Amino acid sequence: MVEEPEVAETLTLKKGAVSTVRGVFQSFSYVGPAADVAILLLGTVAFALIATPLAIIVAWLIYGLWMITPYEFSKYRTNAGSYYSYSAGATKNGALGPLSLVSWMGENLSGQSFGILGLAGFIFAISSYISGISYLWIVFAIIITVYMFILPYLGIKLSTEYMAITGIMELLVLVIGAVIIIIRLGSANSAAPFAFPSGGTVGSFFFGVVFSIVDFTGLGTVTTLSEEVKDSRKKIKRALVIAWVLAGVALIPASYALVLGWTNGGFGAITGYAGAPDPGLLVFQKYLGPVGFILLIIFTINSYFSYGVSKTNAVSRIWYSAARDQVIFPKFIGKLHPKNKTPSNAMALWLGISFVLDVILGLIYGPTNAGLILLTMAGIAIIAVHMVANTGLTLFSYNVLRKQGKSSILLHYIAPSTATIIGLVIIYETLASEISVYYSDPTSLNLAYLVIVIFSILWVIIGGTGMMAYYLIKKPHIAEKAGTFDAD
């Protein structure tokens, strides 16, 4: 027998502290919709062009398909480890647990650049004067990193309440802003953005879909709060659906308004959108005046901060859950703050590593490019996490639910398998694209993108399977218990 970590016996996360609404905005804030509107949609528009709204819709539907796995698992498992615990508990030997955890660590250690480096990139795009001050971006990185620690450290109730309040306001600004722009467009409104492209533009359109999928990353993170949600087996799945719907409401109308607002607002052809500094802000200023311009700036900045808080909540609980299981992380990562009942050790370790990594790459490539390089890894790694969990759902259904008469061919076999195939296609297309780009334009930056894609794939395949083999061979007793904790 292996002695259980002390933390599991003496202290637990604060059960009942998170309501359904707060859980919804844990996921919604991770998406960072205002930041997507202001900045991240650039990648989608660069490839999908006028069909960007359709690309967003397709990506949203694909992510909805990926949400089936956490929705189904949340009915049967209440564990802060989320996809890690779902995957680990899918089989008796827990084989998928280490694979899922390593994959997710790849996203954990790279995706935070959206907040830590993205904030500086956004502010720099607003003001050439500010961007000209050497190393000022490091100050912004320090500020947001400290914020990302303090609010989650003080308690899950405080951090989720902050995200719920600001998230509702952010949603209203985006929806109302989009509606006003659409109304002001008048006869310029068109169905063209929803027309499926033809000919040589089809490939570019689907690459735009790939970028759009990244916009919805994090919608499943409410599952990391499952141990803190009262009656979580009912409320988590409800929160997942609501968050997914709200993300679509926030981004789909906004993408339509921005695309047509740009092409009809005197800014030139849509091909110039991706190369413009903060085009979302330019469109808001054109149609909503200084008030709309300032509001989008305020809520975009807040979007980076709320994303950071949501990210810290999620990552710290994943690492806490794994440390509790004694998988990869040492016991001290699984200790909770005695008063706040938050995984403060996990928060400090993760943010410390993340900050150092972001600053190093920021010094080499600049904050904006470094952030995009790291986000490339985050996208590949999180897709791998979904793929492992999808496989886990099928195995769990076969091994457990089938015997209980609860297995579903559609939800547990067809849907997750389809989602996994889509994930494989996305990773393949990303690799093929980066190879093509580098060989047509062999710059050091394009080389960095190609290297990070290859590294990300190897991280999952070699790192993940290697760790899985290690636990199955050397520590099978730990692998078997991984992910089995259930707060309910």
Where are the model-predicted features located?
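Extracellular loop-to-transmembrane helix junctions
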Residues: 36-132, 448-463, 475
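Transmembrane helix-loop boundary segments of multi-pass membrane transporters
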Residues: 42-53, 121-137, 156-167, 295, ...
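Membrane-interface "cap" regions at the ends of multi-pass membrane proteins
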Residues: 1-51, 64, 68, 470-488
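C-terminal membrane-solvent junction of multi-pass transporters and transport-like membrane proteins
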Residues: 162, 331-341, 383-436, 446-450, ...
